[in-house]
């Protein structure tokens, strides 16, 4: 399994998480999942400044994002604006 954000490959005892629903289901390593989860919580709470901060952090981590990850991020961006 490979992280859809940073491209990290799963090794023995590594945790990977599945996020999203429908067409935009993505697999994330634990570090990327933590930041992505914070983005979703910021979205629910209406915290635009924190959302932008976590989005920037996730963008820095995204060395080789997949198309599914980009689609998932665009869906979140459309909800905040």
Predicted features and spans:
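Short Cys/His-rich "knuckle" micro-motifs
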Residues: 13-16, 39-41
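N-terminal processing/targeting junctions
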Residues: 22-23, 34, 77
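Short linker/helix segments within small regulatory modules
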Residues: 14-26
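Cys/His-rich microdomains that often coordinate metals
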Residues: 10-11, 36
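Short, intrinsically disordered terminal segments enriched in charged and Pro/Gly residues
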Residues: 40-81
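N-terminal cationic leader/targeting segments used for protein routing and processing
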Residues: 9-10, 26-28, 64, 80
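Short cysteine-rich clusters marking metal-coordination/redox-active sites
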Residues: 3-6, 29-32
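Short Cys/His-centered divalent metal-binding micro-motifs
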Residues: 30-42
């Amino acid at each position: 399994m490979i992280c859809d954000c940073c491209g990290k490959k799963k090794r023995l005892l590594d945790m990977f998480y599945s996020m999203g629903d429908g067409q935009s289901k993505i697999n994330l390593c634990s570090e990327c999942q933590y930041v992505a989860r914070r983005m979703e919580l910021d979205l629910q709470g209406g915290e635009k400044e924190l959302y932008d901060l976590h989005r920037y952090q996730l963008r820095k981590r995204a060395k080789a994002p997949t198309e599914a990850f980009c689609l998932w991020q665009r869906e979140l961006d459309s909800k905040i604006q």
